[in-house]
Amino acid sequence: MESQQLSNYPQISHGSACASVTSKEVHTNQDPLDVSASKTEECEKASTKANSQQTTTPASSAVPENPHHASPQPASVPPPQNGPYPQQCMMTQNQANPSGWSFYGHPSMIPYTPYQMSPMYFPPGPQSQFPQYPSSVGTPLSTPSPESGNTFTDSSSADSDMTSTKKYVRPPPMLTSPNDFPNWVKTYIKFLQNSNLGGIIPTVNGKPVRQITDDELTFLYNTFQIFAPSQFLPTWVKDILSVDYTDIMKILSKSIEKMQSDTQEANDIVTLANLQYNGSTPADAFETKVTNIINRLNNNGIHINNKVACQLIMRGLSGEYKFLRYTRHRHLNMTVAELFLDIHAIYEEQQGSRNSKPNYRRNLSDEKNDSRSYTNTTKPKVIARNPQKTNNSKSKTARAHNVSTSNNSPSTDNDSISKSTTEPIQLNNKHDLHLGQELTESTVNHTNHSDDELPGHLLLDSGASRTLIRSAHHIHSASSNPDINVVDAQKRNIPINAIGDLQFHFQDNTKTSIKVLHTPNIAYDLLSLNELAAVDITACFTKNVLERSDGTVLAPIVKYGDFYWVSKKYLLPSNISVPTINNVHTSESTRKYPYPFIHRMLAHANAQTIRYSLKNNTITYFNESDVDWSSAIDYQCPDCLIGKSTKHRHIKGSRLKYQNSYEPFQYLHTDIFGPVHNLPKSAPSYFISFTDETTKFRWVYPLHDRREDSILDVFTTILAFIKNQFQASVLVIQMDRGSEYTNRTLHKFLEKNGITPCYTTTADSRAHGVAERLNRTLLDDCRTQLQCSGLPNHLWFSAIEFSTIVRNSLASPKSKKSARQHAGLAGLDISTLLPFGQPVIVNDHNPNSKIHPRGIPGYALHPSRNSYGYIIYLPSLKKTVDTTNYVILQGKESRLDQFNYDALTFDEDLNRLTASYQSFIASNEIQQSDDLNIESDHDFQSDIELHPEQPRNVLSKAVSPTDSTPPSTHTEDSKRVSKTNIRAPREVDPNISESNILPSKKRSSTPQISNIESTGSGGMHKLNVPLLAPMSQSNTHESSHASKSKDFRHSDSYSENETNHTNVPISSTGGTNNKTVPQISDQETEKRIIHRSPSIDASPPENNSSHNIVPIKTPTTVSEQNTEESIIADLPLPDLPPESPTEFPDPFKELPPINSHQTNSSLGGIGDSNAYTTINSKKRSLEDNETEIKVSRDTWNTKNMRSLEPPRSKKRIHLIAAVKAVKSIKPIRTTLRYDEAITYNKDIKEKEKYIEAYHKEVNQLLKMKTWDTDEYYDRKEIDPKRVINSMFIFNKKRDGTHKARFVARGDIQHPDTYDSGMQSNTVHHYALMTSLSLALDNNYYITQLDISSAYLYADIKEELYIRPPPHLGMNDKLIRLKKSLYGLKQSGANWYETIKSYLIKQCGMEEVRGWSCVFKNSQVTICLFVDDMILFSKDLNANKKIITTLKKQYDTKIINLGESDNEIQYDILGLEIKYQRGKYMKLGMENSLTEKIPKLNVPLNPKGRKLSAPGQPGLYIDQDELEIDEDEYKEKVHEMQKLIGLASYVGYKFRFDLLYYINTLAQHILFPSRQVLDMTYELIQFMWDTRDKQLIWHKNKPTEPDNKLVAISDASYGNQPYYKSQIGNIYLLNGKVIGGKSTKASLTCTSTTEAEIHAISESVPLLNNLSYLIQELNKKPIIKGLLTDSRSTISIIKSTNEEKFRNRFFGTKAMRLRDEVSGNNLYVYYIETKKNIADVMTKPLPIKTFKLLTNKWIH
């Protein structure tokens, strides 16, 4: 029975009894055991509340039941062993308790565990005497002590006493940690005192007041054992018990001795940290006090070295001694003795000056009394009204400063000044006043509030309407607490304490008075010039005097800094009693923290939660009384109103009522939030949260996706954390029915670990309220933190993590405890916390340069999980760091945008709050700011790619990152950065350098090529054979010299001259010097490879020009060279490094024949246009061939593949059926049917929105008179061919709106019901890109319009019928159409004719010939795409005029007027455009791709290394035949079409760099092998990784007289199946890429020259059409140019020889090019292969080359 009772006795939870007494609560001269009555009373009240919530079972246990342990242990479980105690038992009433007695105050069984085998164990009988409770009810401290009246009664008297008094004694809390033993002992001693055992407690000398009895010793021993388990005892206690396990008295005596010692040490440390000295006391006394403290600490083992001691002393100096703070910059090794010598010297000088001062104003005793009564305090900064310029004044805005704490400032007197004074009195330093040369101040005691204030003077302020003064000594006839409302220049209220008169006695013996207001909350004493003018006194800044209107000089004006001042010596002191003015000053010790500051510090939690937390000590360091709660009720935080805005309050009590009780960490709630869009790839898009049911402890983890393996990793992590940290096992996890939780992988994992998944039931959202409310709370906090700090959105999860840390430490109003307390963890030390987004400076100890700034501006995010550091965001490095080496930036607002956070700043409050933590770190951790050997603990844990939304440059104003000077030199405010805030460093990331901290000019991204490489048409291969062309004699010396270099390079451009192998000097377009490069002809190579005569004569013309430019046409107005420079100047060509000319040996030998098996190609392109591919080494350096394609996907095969050629036969494949299947494959359905959207839609909110959209569409149809509503027709009477099926489709647009559309089934429309000759025209993409480019260059306004229900404006000519909409309920009837319904074959053409006619007739537009849907007049250009219109105009009013005309006929909606001069964002035909007029335009599709790609079900690899190129050279598609069944074949073909369809859409819109890969894979849609699918997945993965890339355009130079249209062409010879060549073209208008094309040549070419001719001929027609369009839209002259890297092609175009064309196909193409060049002013120029950006259109390239050719125009 005893063991069963013992097992049922639960442990007493930590903190359930009275709170522990900390060293903070013990004063210097107070006994450590003498806890104040108020504190004890609060402790008793808290304990009473805690015990009142606990249930007690009288029959089983007197100890309150712990709610954390709801499930009792079975009786069969053996009793737990408690450390060294051999056995446990239960002391019943028959053994040790007198009848009716227990230390809980009512009959019960006491947990009693004596040593039964020890001689000290005496089982007491029923008559044993135990101490009784007092008969009177009162506070525990009022209980009579045992020594004064300790009485013992029998059990009967005890019963009567307990019946009458009902006095309860509360037990001490359970000891849960060795570190908590000192605090626990205090509560245990109070427990003994309340139990009338105070007399047995040892005193300071170690002896009790009276002798302890055996029964008392037994009681003492058993209670100590119960509440102090042995596993939680400190080592020194265990040592005592190991000698004598009953010597509890010795433990108590030693504990009291330690408390005495610790109290003295704590008091010394606090005193040393808060030293203040301003000369008001003798310097000898101050030195003695400090020396004694330091000696005591050193004797007690706390070593305070000179460095730290001097730092602490100087920190407390003020007044005349303040400048000694900066002595350490000159004397780093200053000792305490040397510092006190300086203090003594200043004190003696100060005393001497005081003795010599006249005392006609006030006597010394008055000054002392005033000093004591008006001790100055630190106040929040308040900016006074700005002095404005009057006459010749040069006044500037007064800056805000903290009010310092000096009581005695230097005083000066102004000497007499003659009336003829005209020279200004210019003071360079405030200390000039007390040099005794010109001016001295009056003896009026004045407080120096600001560093840049002139002591003893009033600031002249022309902008202030009232005079304000901080000192009450000059106020006459004062009245307290006036009802006056005063605001500063920023419209912030200034509290006014009193109003009175300010009396002047000027040097001409005249007296004047003005009204003055008293307030201590200003930075300067302000003298209003307006009030002086009211009494006929003006300030003359020419003479620098105050004078009357008659010219009488009254007083001089002193200029100090940027302001003008007048001395206070002219003020008459008052005899006012200082205490009559209320709240003039508040002492430093009683000043409270403002509530807005605490509100912001604690993550914007509400006031009630903060007060509960402070009351229950879940937030340490300060108490509830330290906060000013006066403004908490009415305070409205603007950031909370914005960030936490909700529709309505959450319904309370929405938890499941039937949920069982579990022990801590056995029942978890979890939920996932996300995705968050428009973030960089490195930022998480989701987070998953967990909440413990019992403790309400919360965890959050970031996620980049919601895949099964990602969720499984998080579950594995948190289960291991709970098991290891809390020794608990999770039994149940409650979650919703999302696929991330219901998948098979997670279900098996939970089943394997014995965890029960608890899913929410259908339509039961209340069951998941815990997790959902947590996510809502965290998101509210996140929005508020980002709004408050102004940090970029990609740091959103850091705000979530900061909020989680704080929320776990805040007390719940219901349980009165925090989650950390429930979990048994210590409270949050707020002194280690910084506000989210707090500006800081992080130290860089290892810069590249010694003159480089060592401070990196950053923003504090949250405490680190993995160290004692802080996570800080560094915008300049685009990183977050984990470091303790930072300094809080003072005097700067934390917001990064243009809004001010608040009227208050909290620099002083933050200093006070963190002073203790920052000042008493180990001495080896306190570093000087100018120490050149500081280490750092930078741990750059993550690289953050910044969102285009950059942080605002508030920090750049304080510490410019581009400056080479230290941050402290920029503003005076930065001088006030506390040096003690520098944390101890550990290690620094070696990657921090000047290059990545400071912005610099844009560096070239050109790679340093260290090997001799040939890149014929872009393919880079190392040459291991001699080249063909010998060096000319003119360049032999230069080449020989260059060949001696170890790092030499050569050009990859070779002459196409077959007979003359001389070098051709090349004019570099990249700004490098001319080079001599050998040239090799394509024809010579063809001879050696193919062994037959060339198909085209490539002989050069008669004049072998040494210049590489071969223009065919020379205009009369522009020279060839100028034309070439004009065309190439603005092209986005790569910058190449300068190359040294290289000497080449003998010509090539006979080349081996080409391998016939290599006629096929791949994404790697085996047949580069370089004719030497067959002889080049395939081995490349690791750097060149690096692909960064490291993925975990098993389906991606990286083996060498031999060919892209599709198989000539497929087993078990019906080819004709497959081709038809491909043509009939339907696109991805993104819409819903009527039954899906409305009838069976279980989402009530979404269903309501679709119903609303449905009725809106029906109303629009009726409004437009879409059908004849007068007559309904019977189905049997109408020809079935004229009946068109109809349906409603529903979809959700990207902006979140729900839309319904009534459409006709045009896909099954009979051909007799429409005219097949009619066409539905839309604007061509090249026309749109051309218009956008011209708009940028000409500063056009771009207006985007949308015409609602456009097709319904067009009448229909044919007789067609449709079924009525479902809501009419007439299934057997038909209605006749009158308008062009969406879906009909003829609707698009009807609408085009309708809108075209209206634009021409009513709007005065005309359609550009050859370019459908492009309309123009003299002012406006319109691009039409169905119902979307894009208007371009130089004058916005012209656009508005067109809009007005359109609105007369059509329902026209303005999507974007485009009137702003800032960046404007458009969504035009799928392109996401960012346009700033006159500057730039960026085109991308990031949002669209983020939405569409995940829907393709492609196995994306977000955690793997991101791809740097869409493919890699050297990979070939196998020739193996497909052996799959027909169903699988169709499924894969369908998948290929979806993937390639999306890729083609993106590629032809703006991602022209992907067109080669898209075109090559598109040729294999009918060959969906595993390898082809893998390559397609790789392409989609690259698109996903680079979805944020944009096509970048910059405005053309305004001085350019012409429009320049250029086509850059390239071809890759024979690298496609059946020896076909790949050709590619890129089109540029004024240097901006507007289009591109990559395709397989239709004819088989027999040489590289033929392939290049074919590529150029394909580009000419589009070039001419674009030229016509540009001339129609813009009247500037146009220059057309063609660039190619084939010299032989240029020679053929220029030549007039027609005899050597081998066949007519390419002969006609060449002749056509000659005609174009000669007749259409087309210029043809040569471009180096390394600069030919069209190379990406014809072959796969190494990563470096791919980036080099594309990073100038798409990034």
Curated annotation (Swiss-Prot):
Domain comment in the entry: The C-terminal RNA-binding region of CA is sufficient for all its nucleocapsid-like chaperone activities. Integrase core domain contains the D-x(n)-D-x(35)-E motif, named for the phylogenetically conserved glutamic acid and aspartic acid residues and the invariant 35 amino acid spacing between the second and third acidic residues. Each acidic residue of the D,D(35)E motif is independently essential for the 3'-processing and strand transfer activities of purified integrase protein.
Stretch list, region RNA-binding: 299-401
Domain of life the protein comes from: Eukaryota
GN (gene name): TY1B-OL
Gene Ontology biological-process annotations: DNA integration; DNA recombination; proteolysis; transposition; viral translational frameshifting
Catalytic residues of the enzyme: 461
Motif position, Bipartite nuclear localization signal: 1178-1212
GO molecular function: aspartic-type endopeptidase activity; ATP binding; DNA binding; DNA-directed DNA polymerase activity; RNA binding; RNA-directed DNA polymerase activity; RNA-DNA hybrid ribonuclease activity; zinc ion binding
Domain annotation Reverse transcriptase Ty1/copia-type: ranges: 1338-1476
Residues binding Mg(2+) 2: 1346, 1427-1428
Function as written in the Swiss-Prot or TrEMBL entry: Capsid protein (CA) is the structural component of the virus-like particle (VLP), forming the shell that encapsulates the retrotransposons dimeric RNA genome. The particles are assembled from trimer-clustered units and there are holes in the capsid shells that allow for the diffusion of macromolecules. CA also has nucleocapsid-like chaperone activity, promoting primer tRNA(i)-Met annealing to the multipartite primer-binding site (PBS), dimerization of Ty1 RNA and initiation of reverse transcription.
Amino-acid positions noted as binding Mg(2+) 1 in the UniProt annotation, renumbered to this chain: 671, 736
InterPro entries for this protein: Aspartic_peptidase_AS (IPR001969), DNA/RNA_pol_sf (IPR043502), Integrase_cat-core (IPR001584), Retrotran_Ty1/copia-like (IPR039537), RNaseH-like_sf (IPR012337), RNaseH_sf (IPR036397), RVT_2 (IPR013103), TYA (IPR015820)
Keywords assigned: Aspartyl protease, ATP-binding, Cytoplasm, DNA integration, DNA recombination, DNA-binding, DNA-directed DNA polymerase, Endonuclease, Hydrolase, Magnesium, Metal-binding, Multifunctional enzyme, Nuclease, Nucleotide-binding, Nucleotidyltransferase, Nucleus, Phosphoprotein, Protease, RNA-binding, RNA-directed DNA polymerase, Transferase, Transposable element, Transposition, Viral release from host cell, Virion maturation, Zinc, Zinc-finger
Location of the region described as Integrase-type zinc finger-like in the Swiss-Prot/TrEMBL record: 583-640
Compartments where found: Cytoplasm; Nucleus
Domain Integrase catalytic: 660-835
A Gene Ontology term for the protein's cellular component: nucleus
Phosphoserine modified-residue sites: 416
Annotated site location: Cleavage: 401-402, 582-583, 1217-1218
Biased composition (Low complexity): 153-165, 402-418, 960-969
Catalytic reactions of this protein: DNA(n) + a 2'-deoxyribonucleoside 5'-triphosphate = DNA(n+1) + diphosphate; Endonucleolytic cleavage to 5'-phosphomonoester
Protein name: Transposon Ty1-OL Gag-Pol polyprotein
The species this protein was found in: Saccharomyces cerevisiae (strain ATCC 204508 / S288c)
Subunit structure comment from the entry: The capsid protein forms a homotrimer, from which the VLPs are assembled. The protease is a homodimer, whose active site consists of two apposed aspartic acid residues.
Parts forming coiled coils: none
